[in-house]
């Protein structure tokens, strides 16, 4: 990571985030996806952040939980996320781990395009963010999400309606709160 403003305890967390985003591998080497991000960030940052968000949903248990459990138009704050997640993760993570993870996620929403631009955590009031539908999903991000979903589920064929089933985990609808209209429009 070279020269940076991260504290000693932040560096391992940031490396973990880069691995979850599939930007670096387990040996901290830039991946092919990471190089794609470097090559395209200047020209299409919104696409790159959408692809990063998709990867993090699949690779981070807490972010995956967020995508699958916080609904469109649902307001939240860190304390509420931690409380809800603790009920789900109490046997796997300590309360402090969950609190710190959601504190970091709130920072991602506040200081990266994942919040306002991708609509995952838009300012709602002084203390709350809200999750909205991300209506400007690119064809590339849509295709990538479908690929990740098919790969994760061993699927060879996908139907739009399957993404709206109650038991559907991850996928474009959960990742970006897509309405059926937006999803179908993106497929045309």
Each PLM stretch: what is its role?
Residues 1-188:
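Donor-sugar nucleotide-binding helix/loop cap in glycosyltransferases
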């Amino acid at each position: 990571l070279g020269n940076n403003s991260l504290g000693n305890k932040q560096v391992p967390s940031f490396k973990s985030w880069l691995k979850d985003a599939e930007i670096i591998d387990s040996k901290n080497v830039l991946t092919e996806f990471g190089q794609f991000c470097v090559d395209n960030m200047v020209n299409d940052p919104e696409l790159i952040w959408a692809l990063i968000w998709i990867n993090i949903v699949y690779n981070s248990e807490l972010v995956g939980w967020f995508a699958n459990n916080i609904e469109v138009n649902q307001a939240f704050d860190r304390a509420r996320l931690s409380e809800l997640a603790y009920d789900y993760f109490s046997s796997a993570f300590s309360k402090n781990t969950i609190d710190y993870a959601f504190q970091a996620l709130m920072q991602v929403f506040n200081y990266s395009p994942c919040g306002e631009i991708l609509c995952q955590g838009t300012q709602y009031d002084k203390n709350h963010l809200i999750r909205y539908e991300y209506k400007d999903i690119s064809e590339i991000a849509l295709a990538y999400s479908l690929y990740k979903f098919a790969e994760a589920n061993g699927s060879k064929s996908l139907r739009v309606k399957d993404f709206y089933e109650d038991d559907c985990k991850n996928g474009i609808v959960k990742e970006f709160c897509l309405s059926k209209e937006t999803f179908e429009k993106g497929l045309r």
